[in-house]
């Protein structure tokens, strides 16, 4: 039960600005504010004017403010809440916060208002995470993805999957408790068909979510190739800054260099890697091993070639590993100014001449057809991991049925699938999950 009153600066407090907002929420929020506010206590969803005074030092006036009253449960937090709109000076804002703390409120933890909103049933974790995603969005596509989650349709889609599973679990429980009960045998083709239908929906969600996750967390692009083909030069030219060291000495890049880049509403995360070659130098070899590891982590593999160098076994290894892992593979020939002819197998660029438009447009084209209006996807790695776990549990259940296992074995996997789906929208009893998630929210949110 939530039984204390919390406060934090929701807007402002770090730089001087026009207006700051201080939020107070909890069972004693009205009484705490009344101690330092000279105006009237308004009815719910009204605004009243008055002074904030220092009641501990002769009622000295601190500021003229507007108080917004949100009483009862019909508000964001789901409990009595007051928002004080004061002048936005850093000193004034923090002075009012200190008065609220001195008069009985506790400083809120990061994300605690949103956590209370979740615990009070005002929103689920999908919307809570969407709010945090919107606050931290750095591209137009990220903003659209976050706002899309506000309408609750994704939550309803997850709930529908849970309801379908719950019905089947209920049927199986009856067959376990009352084996003599005459109804559809849970090991019939009909049950398998229904489970496969749910699994196929989840498979589609995973497919859609891979792309939405890339858009929100950044599309990971690993730049690979032999030494001195221009990997670092291409990265620097795209970023328009000297992020990576460029020399004529083979093996200059020995560790991973990462950089974020925004282009046409998308966020890209470039990973420049060590040139891949046969070497006995221990440190360089470690860097080369890391380069191959990045193929597994990447969404896109940029394979850079130099027309003045012949292809070798390392080029084949890069290409084959990217294809074996079903990565988006983009072969790029740098130093196009050295060529007289081209073919359609490669993209042709010149880092030296800053001629990189074909590469930029290729990267955008891969993701331009993403359907941001689809409700059947989840946004982040936490949600995606859970939907994948639910998918695996369903696969295990279907396999167990086909192998003729007893219902009490099959039902374990079905309950696990249901539990994973439930964790996507959130359960109030999962304290570790809530702690981990809300700690990343802003203070005052």
From Swiss-Prot:
Organism per entry: Mycoplasmopsis agalactiae (strain NCTC 10123 / CIP 59.7 / PG2) (Mycoplasma agalactiae)
The job of this chain, per UniProt, is described as:
Exhibits a very high intrinsic GTPase hydrolysis rate. Involved in the addition of a carboxymethylaminomethyl (cmnm) group at the wobble position (U34) of certain tRNAs, forming tRNA-cmnm(5)s(2)U34.
The record describes how the cofactor is bound as: Binds 1 potassium ion per subunit.
Binding locations of GTP: 228-233, 247-253, 272-275
Which positions bind Mg(2+)?
A: 232, 253
**Cofactor(s) for this UniProt protein:** K(+)
Pfam family of the protein (one): MMR_HSR1
Q: What is this protein called?
A: tRNA modification GTPase MnmE
> Gene behind this chain?
mnmE
Which InterPro entries does the record associate with it?
G_TrmE, GTP-bd, GTP-bd_TrmE_N, GTPase_MnmE, MnmE_dom2, MnmE_helical, P-loop_NTPase, Small_GTP-bd
| Family, similarity comment | Belongs to the TRAFAC class TrmE-Era-EngA-EngB-Septin-like GTPase superfamily. TrmE GTPase family.
The record ties this protein, via Gene3D superfamilies, to: P-loop containing nucleotide triphosphate hydrolases, Probable tRNA modification gtpase trme, domain 1, tRNA modification GTPase MnmE domain 2
Q: Where is the TrmE-type G domain?
A: 218-368
Where does the UniProt annotation locate this protein? Cytoplasm
- Any idea which positions bind (6S)-5-formyl-5,6,7,8-tetrahydrofolate? 23, 83, 122, 445
Q: Might you give the EC number(s) for this enzyme?
A: 3.6.-.-
Residues bound to K(+) are: 228, 247, 249, 252
Tell me the PROSITE patterns matching this sequence. Answer: G_TRME
Question: What GO terms in the biological process aspect are recorded for it?
Answer: tRNA methylation; tRNA wobble uridine modification
State the UniProt keywords alphabetically: Cytoplasm, GTP-binding, Hydrolase, Magnesium, Metal-binding, Nucleotide-binding, Potassium, tRNA processing
Q: Summarize the subunit comment.
A: Homodimer. Heterotetramer of two MnmE and two MnmG subunits.
**What Gene Ontology cellular-component terms does the record carry?**
cytosol
Write one Gene Ontology MF term: GTPase activity
